Amino acid sequence: MGGTKHVRIHGSCSPRFERVRYEFERNFTLRDELGAAVAAYVDGELVVNLWAGSADVDGQQPWQEDTLSTVLSGTKGLTSTCLHRLAEAGELDLRLPVAHYWPEFGQAGKGDISLAMVLAHRSGAIGPREPMHWRDVTDWDLVCRRLAAAEPWWRPGTAQGYHMTTYGFIIGEVVHRVTGMTVGQYLHSEVAGPLGAEVHIGVPADQQPYRCADPVGKPTIREMLASAGAPKRPTSLDDHSKAGLAVAMGFAPDDEIATNDLTLWRQLEFPGTNAQVSALGMATFYNALVQEKLLSRTVMDRLRVLQGGTETDLVLGPRVAEHGWGMGYMLNAQGVNGPNRRIFGHGGLGGSFAFADLEHRIGYGYVMNRFDHTQANADPRSVVLSNEIYRALGVPIRPRRETVYDD
């Protein structure tokens, strides 16, 4: 794999963390980086804030400190935090059924699905029973009606399967019914705005040309499903080993909006999949968690408890065992994202990753625009950077087991 021969690294890096800058540059020279940024706080101090490369494939738009990049499922960490804040404030109860707040959702055997089940990807509500055209997915109410009417794909609470797209719709509808705000509005007014963090779910069209990086090399949903050998329209998860993937990824192809109308996709709100963020924004967000500005330590200790062990995920398969799910966050059960197996955060298809480490007081964010969908949320471009942060803190790093997953 080749890379850029010469790249100018912008930003700042405390002397103790200079190896992060070195590896960040090597991402461009050796690991095929196009445009990217990394930021990290340690004990509340910004120690790394670097960016470089191009925000577009033609090299005409230099990456800036506040360049926004899509993090796809990294959005879930933002959305989960909003829900946990509401729960800690007493505005909702995660143990109650979703139908307590959204009565229509209780149809078709879903009456006992709790918010906690959704957070843990154990509700079975991974998609409706019929596919939707990408234009239909721009209609929030229509999607919610389809989800409310659908039977779960397994008995709620008995198995684990990644709620790839439905996660954002289910939690988003509950947040709206409780607060009167969308998740994007709540995130802006109650979390990101007060922090000054550049993390957004929904970016106005007129801001996108000079703010947003273009995704490069990102496969479409159809390409990924075809590559995985997934069936087109399964009626049961018993139909095919990839039936769960086909349902969760293919039912409501909000990603196909990005393929057909990228501006529209960024402008809409999909609280599970389309946040536009800067690396500094994500590091600021997760640092606020470390500093207990958003949630209490008691809540954070609960949300990072492994849910369902490391059983095979009915959507993503056995590879999930390497990280495992907490209550709305990706964990680090096997240590593929650094030495602390108690971090919590979320990665996104393509390589982005952000996390909070309460033990070592780290808030970390890495974003990029050249996609590599083979690394399953342990992209070497990010892992080498976060590992250097740990090394600077004197934390031993075990050798990384290089893995490319075959679904």
Describe each region flagged by the PLM.
Residues 25, 99, 123, 148-152, ...:
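Amphipathic, well-packed alpha-helical segments that form the structural scaffold of globular domains
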Residues 130, 160-173:
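Internal, well-ordered domain-core segments that constitute the primary functional module
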Residues 2-54, 159, 176-194, 206-407:
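Catalytic loop of the DD-peptidase/beta-lactamase superfamily, centered on the K-T-G motif
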Residues 79-80, 167-172, 281-284:
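Well-ordered alpha-helical segments within folded domains of soluble proteins
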Residues 21, 116, 141-148, 386:
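Hydrophobic core segments within long, regular secondary-structure runs in both alpha-
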Residues 65, 70-74, 86-126, 130, ...:
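Active-site helix/loop module of the DD-peptidase/beta-lactamase fold
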Residues 26-39, 51, 58-118, 155-165, ...:
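Short active-site loop at a secondary-structure junction
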